[in-house]
Amino acid sequence: MKPQFSQLHVLRHDKWLLSCLTWIPILLALLIWGVFSAGIARDLPIGVVDNAHSTLSRKLTHMLDASSTMSVDYQFSDLLQAKNAMIEGKVYAYVIIPEHFDRDIYLQRAPQVSVFYNSQYILIGRLISSAVVQAQGFFNAGLETVKSLSHGNSTVQGALGNAVTISTQISPLFNQNTNYAQFLVSAVVPAIWQIMIVVCSILILAANLRVYARKPEHLDRWLGNQPFKVISKTLAAYLPIFLLHGFAFLFWFYFMLDWPFQGHLLPIMIAQLATTIACMIMGAFFFFMTLDAARAMSFAGAFTAPSFAFMGITFPVSDMGSLAQFWRSLLPISHYIEVQVAQASYGTSALTSLTHLLPMASYVLPAFLAVVLAKRHLKKTEATNVPV
């Protein structure tokens, strides 16, 4: 029975493998989407400790609350209450307005407004820090404008010009709405896709070994004397399924969710083909290291665990350490994501994008090693089965 025609038989005997190839990837992708579906972080709860209780302190509080990023949900009477609220997770930050806030402003003593935020939430901390600076900037500009008008400047435009000497326009490119779903999901889902391919490749080989050889000691019943041919045909039967997964999330991102797409799908699909083959090679390599699915899964988990972190999406590659950059170069998905970003965000030429795939030629080495290991196991099997 030829392996490429017998995989339905394998799937009937391995429901877990069938699940990993069908509904589990879809469920994981939808769960990730559900986590980030809000897209933009809004109305993050903060608190205010207003020690001044004055007109200007209330105006500053209103400025903070007017920000789309923050929402002043709590007014605390003292610092201890605010600190406890942050520890309990009720607020992500609190603002302390000092006593004599109005008086110091009128006397030009520059009162200090203190802001404390929970930096354990890196993304939220950055958002709140930026929003507070922006709100305080508007507040200061308003004060300077009123001051300039009170000194006889006859036009609001002129007073505003004195208050804000340089006007800055900051325009985001490539993710203009700063949509975190677009930013994170488009990288997390491919990372999960890579893990699923490597894991499923191990499960496929383990299932074929179990169904057609029964035991590792009878490996020759499955691989015969042509391990490369049998392994290639076995895994090739599942190649369309993995490619279908890849095309499905592209269709979901750029057609159903209608995220901006500047380039062409063909280079990305070529990158998906190369990535799928590379991941299947790594799965085969891990499996034939031990012929044990559990230990192979451990190797695969250690190998693919930092996929998302090392992609270079949330942390620049240039700032990574040498070890991180080396590990990143070993991950197929890190080369794929370069092509996806180049096409989806930048619209670069197909040839320029596909040059990111050149390092993937090095996966010939683990492919060769997988075959060598398979032959080694076959020799052990032959030695074991030699009649005495």
Language-model region placement:
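Hydrophobic core positions of alpha-helical segments in small-molecule transporters
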Residues: 20-21, 232-233, 299
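Transmembrane alpha-helix boundary/anchor motif
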Residues: 26, 30, 127, 196-200, ...
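Extracytoplasmic/periplasmic domains immediately adjacent to an N-terminal transmembrane anchor
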Residues: 1-181, 383-388
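Membrane-spanning alpha-helical segments of multipass transporters and channels
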Residues: 240, 251-252, 259-388
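Hydrophobic alpha-helical transmembrane segments of multi-pass membrane transport proteins
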Residues: 28-30, 171-253
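Hydrophobic alpha-helical segments typical of transmembrane helices
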Residues: 56-60, 201, 339
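Peri-membrane helix termini and adjoining interfacial loops of integral membrane proteins
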Residues: 157-167, 245, 330-341
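Membrane-helix interfacial "entry" motifs
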Residues: 6, 10-13, 175-184, 222-230, ...
